[in-house]
């Protein structure tokens, strides 16, 4: 069972799931500011941590992110626990990348990526994952 950090109204029409980036936890300053702003707009915000960050919180040791299969499964588990109906998924940097990789399989309609590198610096031809639904990018 995933431990969530919730912000916003419990009876919101939509919930947005936010995953942290590679180096900072779900309650980092950046994530707190974003969650607060989204909650003030009427969204319910659900933050969670990938397994490697849970371990870091338990023992204080920094470690690299889990391999992609673990991150993907973890995000899909979060979606299953909350239910994909009326769910927006996303995250900061690595968390956004993982969200973009599970969006189709998760059955969610909206994806939000914050601080997400859609392509390596100076290489726009190497764009991010193949997102098959209408999308817009705001830099």
Question: Where do the PLM segments sit?
Answer:
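The feature captures the conserved acid-bearing segment of alpha/beta-hydrolase catalytic domains
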Residues: 120-139
């Amino acid at each position: 069972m995933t431990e969530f950090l919730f912000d916003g109204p419990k009876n919101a029409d939509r919930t947005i799931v936010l995953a942290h980036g590679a180096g900072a936890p779900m309650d980092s300053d950046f994530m707190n500011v974003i969650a607060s702003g989204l909650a003030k707009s009427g969204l319910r915000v659900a933050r969670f941590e990938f397994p490697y960050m849970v371990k870091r919180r338990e023992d204080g040791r920094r470690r690299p992110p889990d391999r992609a299969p673990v991150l993907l499964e973890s995000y899909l588990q979060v979606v299953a626990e909350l239910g994909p109906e009326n769910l927006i998924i996303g995250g900061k940097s690595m968390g956004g990348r993982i969200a973009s990789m599970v969006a189709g399989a998760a059955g969610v309609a909206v994806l939000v990526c914050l601080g997400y590198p859609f392509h390596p610096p100076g290489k726009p031809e190497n764009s991010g994952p193949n997102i098959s639904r209408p999308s817009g990018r705001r830099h």
